[in-house]
Amino acid sequence: MSWQTYVDEHLMCEIDGQHLTAAAIIGHDGSIWAQSESFPQVKSEQITGVMNDFAEPGSLAPTGLFLGDNKYMVIQGEPGAVIRGKKGSGGVTIKKTNMALIVGIYDEPMTPGQCNMVVERLGDYLYDQGF
């Protein structure tokens, strides 16, 4: 299965009639493995900041989490495993696996819990597969 298939069928899937706004699978080095058409153009330093926050939880909190031109307020996640951000009525969930970051961006009416479930379920599966 291609990485794009994981994005299209497992991240951008329908959950209770709702979909993520955008999603991507990004290597720890910042390389894009696959992304939805709507995923923002991220800068390498933004991925470096995310990786630093996984290594030192809380390092993004003072500045916020940036993905492309969007700034998210960092909210409670799981140190070293999941980063969550909020922006208005939407937000982002980032799950770290052995080799990649699974990123899901949502907006109302999708809920944070639905986004977390979609992103973390795929992240846990890929982690268990060695990715």
UniProtKB/Swiss-Prot annotation:
The keyword Cytoplasm applies. InterPro entries: PFN (IPR048278), PFN_euk (IPR005455), PFN_sf (IPR036140), Profilin_CS (IPR027310). CDD domains: PROF. One of its GO terms (cellular component) is cell cortex. It comes from the Eukaryota. It is found in: Cytoplasm, Cytoskeleton. GO terms for molecular function: actin monomer binding. It holds the Pfam family Profilin. Its main location: cytoplasm. Keywords: Actin-binding, Cytoplasm, Cytoskeleton. Occurs in many kinds of cells as a complex with monomeric actin in a 1:1 ratio. PANTHER family: PROFILIN, PROFILIN-2. Belongs to the profilin family. Binds to actin and affects the structure of the cytoskeleton. At high concentrations, profilin prevents the polymerization of actin, whereas it enhances it at low concentrations. By binding to PIP2, it inhibits the formation of IP3 and DG. This is Profilin-2.
